C-alpha cells in the first residue's frame, strides 16, 4: 500500500512521462509535492522503487521509468471524500491527486481492450508466444500510445526488477529497444522470454534480474524484439 505522498509522486512522474517523454527534475517533484527539500523526494523514490512501481535506469540523468501503477486510488482518498458518511466511490482523473465522485447517470470511463497472448518465461525460455486467450480492460492512461498486449509471467528470473511469477506484464509492441529496457525477446523464432536488453558490440545479451540465472548472449540475427515492458498487474 502506498502513502498519499508516494502515490502523488508516482502519478506526477507518470503524467510528465506521458506528456513530454522525460521524467521531471527533483526540483519539479519537490515543488509539485510542496516539500521543503530534495531529500524527501529521494526517500519517496526509493520507497516506490523498493515496491516495484518505478525503476531507475543506470548511467542516464533523470532516468526514471514507471513500471506499474497501483490497482486503486491512494489510501484515504475515498474516506476523505465521503467525510466519514459511508462509502463514496472515487476515480482518479488525469491531473495530480484530483478525484471526483462517480455519478449514477455518468457514462463509464473509456477503457482499452488489451489482448492476453498467453505466457512468457521469466526463467528458462518457453515456446514462442501463444495465441490470444482473453482480454484485459484497462484505463488508457495506464498504457499511453501504441499497440499493446499482455502476457502472464512464469518464473522468477526478473524478481529484482519487481516482476514476480504470476504477474501480468503489459507490453508495447515494437521491434527496437534501448539497452537497459525490459523486453519480450523471441530467440531463434522458437523461444520467448522476458529479459533486460544489453548490447555487447554486435551481439545481444538477455540479462536476468536474478543472480541465479546467467546472462545469455546471441548474435543479432537470432533475437527479434517483440515489445517493451510498460506496466505490470499483480493480483493478491
Curated annotation (Swiss-Prot):
Q: What is its EC number?
A: 3.4.21.88
One GO molecular function term of this record is: serine-type endopeptidase activity
DNA-binding residues (ranges): 26-46
Q: Is Cytoplasm tagged as a keyword?
A: no
Residues annotated as catalytic? 157, 195
GO BP? DNA repair; DNA replication; negative regulation of DNA-templated transcription; proteolysis; SOS response
Q: Which residues cross the membrane?
A: none
Indicate the annotated site residue(s) for Cleavage: 122-123
InterPro entries, from UniProt? Answer: LexA, LexA-like, LexA/Signal_pep-like_sf, LexA_DNA-bd_dom, LexA_repressor, Peptidase_S24_LexA, Peptidase_S24_S26A/B/C, WH-like_DNA-bd_sf
Name the reaction it catalyses: Hydrolysis of Ala-|-Gly bond in repressor LexA
Keywords from the named record: Autocatalytic cleavage, DNA damage, DNA repair, DNA replication, DNA-binding, Hydrolase, Repressor, SOS response, Transcription, Transcription regulation
Q: How does it assemble?
A: Homodimer.
**Family (UniProt):** Belongs to the peptidase S24 family.
PANTHER family for the chain: LEXA REPRESSOR (PTHR33516), LEXA REPRESSOR-RELATED (PTHR33516:SF2)
Protein task: Represses a number of genes involved in the response to DNA damage (SOS response), including recA and lexA. In the presence of single-stranded DNA, RecA interacts with LexA causing an autocatalytic cleavage which disrupts the DNA-binding part of LexA, leading to derepression of the SOS regulon and eventually DNA repair.
Its name, as the record gives it, is LexA repressor
